[in-house]
């Protein structure tokens, strides 16, 4: 029996790396409560790279990061798209 293991980290980097140098928008990067409602901000900039992090100590979860205009953003639970 042949088992194909889904390598999520490879899929992420293979999808993102060809887009380095292009514009990317990350939705709802910052969420703040102003007392009445949540304020959300999107970030648009030039993609400089991507990283993944696997938490081997606790639950083995994987986090995904994009470097945009010199800042690194956690996009694990964020939508992003290339413009």
Regions found by a protein language model. Give the residues of each.
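Short hydrophobic/aromatic patches at helix-to-coil boundaries
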Residues: 79-83
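Mixed-charge, Lys/Arg-rich low-complexity intrinsically disordered regions
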Residues: 1-33
């Amino acid at each position: 029996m042949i088992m194909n293991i889904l390598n999520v980290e490879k899929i992420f980097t293979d999808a993102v790396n060809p887009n380095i140098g292009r514009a990317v928008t990350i939705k709802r990067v910052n969420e703040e409560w102003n007392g009445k409602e949540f304020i959300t901000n999107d970030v648009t900039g030039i993609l400089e790279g991507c990283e993944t992090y696997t938490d081997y100590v606790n639950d083995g979860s994987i986090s995904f990061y994009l470097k945009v205009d010199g800042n690194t953003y956690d996009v694990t639970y964020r939508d992003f798209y290339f413009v």
